[in-house]
């Protein structure tokens, strides 16, 4: 038999027979290693222990000590057990893609005989547990691609997935009458799946394309230890309670009307108040930092986006152009930068004017697929807190640091502390996706990296995450659901100033090219509101809360006028307050104020009327305190003015 040469992590090389598996290699080293092994790497790719090795390459044995791979193998095996169980109960079921996610797995299925309901999951879980208790080993067999197609005949989606496999051999996993593939790594036997849970059922288009068949996606998770599963389920429950879609419904913040269209939210009065407060804050903050706010059209001639490059590189995310019938094609703008360039070009510019900072709360439209839409986080119409600075080359580093400092000030005002920095570069292997200028990319990426190093900030580097016209610094955070989101962005751009032939008159009297810096402080109003709703769990800080205080008179006939006087004074001071004079019990009104997450509940009765005080109960606290009404009003006005949750100005996370 032919031989292959395998290279170990320490550089040592050894010859083995062709088709040797990594498990065989582990056994040749030691029995204990083979027992601990759960997977391996071949030329950097994670593969199954029993994957036949057909050519020379570098190998690595992965043991249970590698928690990440161990979890992935656990999730793959649990998904395999799920599919094997479903195949017994639904013989006609078609199986699609199976995927290990960041915290579990899902399997896409299609069953013409009937859908799997959420209420079916407990019974399916019971049957899975029986299969796991059997302790049956999972057999592996390597077959040719043609033989695999024969094995999966009748499984439409599996055959389609096989067509995408480039290798001539396919590793097939078998358990009883059920077979599957593309699940590496997997555990050795079904009883290795110790603790698992089936979570939910949702719809998903085959391979994510809305033109394809809608399938059923069954979600689950599994862990080696019960306490790990319990912790995960607790986290998921907490995430559900923080879900901005749930809270948005409870607090009457927004809704989406299917008659109008998916991804097009209506902002209800409460949500609109929160958004308006954010917008006013942002405008004031930016103006104080040298930005000039503008309004620009949400429609533009298609030629503008052809010149900017959006039409070539971003077309799939843009709505189709509107033919005006006279040769003019109008496009809903996907980004604001070309519009701000036109503002810059409206006047001749001098080096003395730079940096020129232009900002806008600019409405944009993105052609998002329906399957990607989610509440306020992913929408088709959005308003971006956008800004563009035009600088001389010698101003780049200082302006970058200035923008980053402004961002961190904003995070402090919103009490946001959990975020990381990511330098997003182009993928040099994907030249079609990005503006093709190696010198520009290398220069811009080096500048961003140098600025971050100068500041001593930790960051990760990510290839393939840049925009098509330049690298960027992304500020990353996680939603309550555990999804990573980009909170803010700073991006260097040498391309658009060249495409639009931007100039300024230099000190030497000659024309020079400015550098453009794109930045978004808090993403879109939609996404930022969703994010804040989740991190605050709906208990917005007083300055953002739709209703900042509710006043409850003990007896309307005796105490209403006093309550109204307090309300009028608070409104005069710019506060949002209402009186609850409904004919309901006092306890009911107080509980409702708490469930509505109103920051302050004020009760006024005989004592308060006689002493010009209010009984103040802060949200989340059990006890009320008596305060002079004027002192309370002064205190809440100061709290709102400080943009904080506790009446104190928060400090920056880092000093620049």
UniProtKB/Swiss-Prot annotation:
Secretion signal span? none
Query: Where the protein is mainly located, per its record?
Result: cytoplasm
The subcellular localization recorded is: Cytoplasm
Its recorded reaction(s) are:
tRNA(Thr) + L-threonine + ATP = L-threonyl-tRNA(Thr) + AMP + diphosphate + H(+)
Residues bound to Zn(2+) are 337, 388, 518
Gene Ontology cellular component annotations, sorted alphabetically: cytoplasm
* A single GO molecular function term of this UniProt record: transferase activity
* The protein's Enzyme Commission number: 6.1.1.3
Instruction: Using the UniProt annotation, give all residue ranges assigned to the region (Catalytic).
Output: 243-541
| Family annotation (Pfam families) | HGTP_anticodon, TGS, tRNA-synt_2b
- Family stated for the protein in its record: Belongs to the class-II aminoacyl-tRNA synthetase family.
What does this protein's UniProt record list under function?
Catalyzes the attachment of threonine to tRNA(Thr) in a two-step reaction: L-threonine is first activated by ATP to form Thr-AMP and then transferred to the acceptor end of tRNA(Thr). Also edits incorrectly charged L-seryl-tRNA(Thr).
Q: What is this protein called?
A: Threonine--tRNA ligase
Question: Which source organism?
Answer: Latilactobacillus sakei subsp. sakei (strain 23K) (Lactobacillus sakei subsp. sakei)
Q: Kindly list the organism's lineage.
A: Bacteria, Bacillati, Bacillota, Bacilli, Lactobacillales
- Gene, per the UniProt record: thrS
